[in-house]
Amino acid sequence: KHHSVASHPELAARSFLISSFGKTYHVTGWKVGYVAAPPSLTAEFRKVHQFNVFTVNTPMQFGLASYLEDASHYLNLPAFYQSKRDFFRNGLAKTKFKLLPTPGTYFQCVDYSGINIAQAKLPEEEFCKWLTSAIGVAAIPVSAFYADTAESNVIRFCFAKEEATLNAALQRLQSL
């Protein structure tokens, strides 16, 4: 089950909630993010932010404001993403990828070392490049997010996609 740190008062009082409308609200091309925090934290955040970001285009701001007026759009998101996660995990369970626990996100991490093909011996970044170019499914090596880039054979897939896209990806991944 997905829970926000903002739902826990002690965490909310000392946390920045940083997110993206794109993935959170399933409008992935929009590239608009947001930060929510208590006033004392946002005051400090704005000191840095004002020199890094100028503005977001006006039509996107109006579109998102209109979208947020209907609470059902965001109140139904946990069930929406849980359904996508379950669908994608069930499909991946029919592959040789080892599914890893990844709660509270729209990414599914997998270990590819059990796949019986020569490419499974590639380092994560090279495996992801091969997977994208040869199989047509994009993945990101999790080592890209760590200072210690020791290979772990773990990559992540995003399941914040249309069902047809997920189906096509699963068919390709199941062929490995």
List each model region and its residues.
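PLP-dependent class I/II
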Residues: 1-176
